[in-house]
Amino acid sequence: MRTSQYLLSTLKETPADAEVISHQLMLRAGMIRKLASGLYTWLPTGLRVLKKVENIVREEMNNAGAIEVSMPVVQPADLWQESGRWEQYGPELLRFVDRGERPFVLGPTHEEVITDLVRNELSSYKQLPLNFFQIQTKFRDEVRPRFGVMRSREFLMKDAYSFHTSQESLQETYDAMYAAYSRIFSRMGLDFRAVQADTGSIGGNASHEFQVLAQSGEDDIVFSDVSDYAANIELAEAIAPQTPRAAATQEMTLVDTPNAKTIAELVEQFNLPIEKTVKTLLVKAAKDSKSTLVALLVRGDHELNEVKAEKLPHVASPLTFATEEEIRAVINAGPGSLGPVNMPIPVIIDRTVAAMSDFAAGANIDGKHYFGINWDRDVATPVVADIRNVVAGDPSPDGQGTLLIKRGIEVGHIFQLGTKYSEALKASVQGEDGRNQILTMGCYGIGVTRVVAAAIEQNFDERGIVWPDAIAPFQVAILPMNMHKSFRVQELAEKLYSELRAQGIEVLMDDRKERPGVMFADMELIGIPHTIVIGDRNLDNDDIEYKYRRSGKKSLIKTGDIVDYLVKAIKG
């Protein structure tokens, strides 16, 4: 490809509305342009990267035995009503009616459509297992699209759905998809972790996320410094303290704390170690509970894990925090003065709180706290559960090493759905025993557009993108200096351009009438891995300057050797 026949569209300045580095660089490198909120046009450079990601995904899905299909983006509402998700999915589901007043949705996912297909096409256990995949546009009406294509409303996704007559068969395909995803992200040159995860709104049993490590990531991922253990922070178990609870050394005293409405204020004003404080959070109770609210207690320096809390049988789902008005109606005190002593509603404490002694907590009286509280002496030990987020340095749940926490960007997610959708849509086949058997399902997604952004978040420097070789828009950039004035520079550039293309190498030759500084800046911004610079001065010695984008290392290579050198560097 020649720049004179190409839409380069690079920008010198960073657009003001681009928050994260991937959004900034995708705009500056001429990869995307915003059409409307959460909607982007992919320009040639961006599309080349997107297609490379798509091709790797498709190859590995085919290698894993999945079968490609293509399903409509527009889906009839009755399928979503049949599955129960019409009411559950919320405003992210874009709903509309056609000219015949028939309701439809723009598909955010395709569980209903594929299950409908299978229930109409399959009839016998002999046809299973089958794993269908597509690479298709999705639409989710995000309340606040942000970070460019990282969280857009329209996006490209690879979604796969497998169907089985047994859990054992599902597990085999699940393991195959886990391995395929690991190969996909390894081939792309990404630093990633596969982590245990919550199943969320999709539902089902087992689940793993594939997270690309990046400082800008929205997810906290947890992994052992010794073993292979890794989990999303929502799911990571906080191990109970192994040391026995210390004996009480203080009497419980009621202390006036009129200006301490937060743990931070309490610690600062009374010079308390934060590890000796407890915070109390009130949430809505489950419908069958005798109380309207439940109190959840975590140590002052710990954070409540809302996913864990929501799974407690005493707690309403979805998790809903009580308003100050609701709290005062039950406790007669504000949120900053709550604690376990004389608490008139059910109390659940974290494992770490259960191991505390001589601690401070609200007295359930405005402007007052109890200091020196001890379990069983001052208040009976309530229900104990794991309800906090783990922190760095906690013991690993598998008993090997301690936990590290890093930020991650979710680029893939695999689920064991079980029979959630097949039961709702009555997808069944005749089993081996001749009886009707509801199918067991798996679901496997990769955010193809998100992978592009995540790769940039992990691969950039002050000059621009530093693409992993496998997904770079071009493999080689040829920069002929003053080619329009130097015949030998132009002649060699054309020769190398043809020879490299004949070797199957993707080349971008910058044949613009531009200053060298602009040419260098654009190629580094775009992130092409290999650059060769052809200039009269080096040609006097029969040399070409070669530069590897990732290391920045430059070297002089003889003109007769450069093609073989690049072929070896790229193809091995």
UniProtKB/Swiss-Prot annotation:
A GO term, aspect molecular function: proline-tRNA ligase activity
GO CC annotation terms, alphabetical: cytosol
Gene3D superfamilies found in the cross-reference section: Anticodon-binding domain (3.40.50.800), Bira Bifunctional Protein, Domain 2 (3.30.930.10), YbaK/aminoacyl-tRNA synthetase-associated domain (3.90.960.10)
Presence of the UniProt keyword Transmembrane helix in the record: no
Location relative to the cell: Cytoplasm
Keywords from the named record: Aminoacyl-tRNA synthetase, ATP-binding, Cytoplasm, Ligase, Nucleotide-binding, Protein biosynthesis
SUPFAM superfamilies hit by this protein: Class II aaRS ABD-related, Class II aaRS and biotin synthetases, YbaK/ProRS associated domain
S-S bridge residues: none
Entry EC no(s): 6.1.1.15
Coiled-coil residue windows: none
Reaction(s) catalysed (UniProt annotation): tRNA(Pro) + L-proline + ATP = L-prolyl-tRNA(Pro) + AMP + diphosphate
Superkingdom classification of source: Bacteria
Biological process terms in GO annotation: prolyl-tRNA aminoacylation
Alphabetical list of Pfam families matching this protein: HGTP_anticodon, tRNA-synt_2b, tRNA_edit
Predominant localisation class: cytoplasm
Subunit and partners: Homodimer.
Described function: Catalyzes the attachment of proline to tRNA(Pro) in a two-step reaction: proline is first activated by ATP to form Pro-AMP and then transferred to the acceptor end of tRNA(Pro). As ProRS can inadvertently accommodate and process non-cognate amino acids such as alanine and cysteine, to avoid such errors it has two additional distinct editing activities against alanine. One activity is designated as 'pretransfer' editing and involves the tRNA(Pro)-independent hydrolysis of activated Ala-AMP.
Family indicated by similarity: Belongs to the class-II aminoacyl-tRNA synthetase family. ProS type 1 subfamily.
Recorded domain comment: Consists of three domains: the N-terminal catalytic domain, the editing domain and the C-terminal anticodon-binding domain.
HAMAP family reported for this sequence: Pro_tRNA_synth_type1 (MF_01569)
UniProt xrefs under NCBIfam families: PRK09194.1, proS_fam_II
UniProt name for this protein: Proline--tRNA ligase
Biological source species: Salmonella choleraesuis (strain SC-B67)
Gene name in the database record: proS
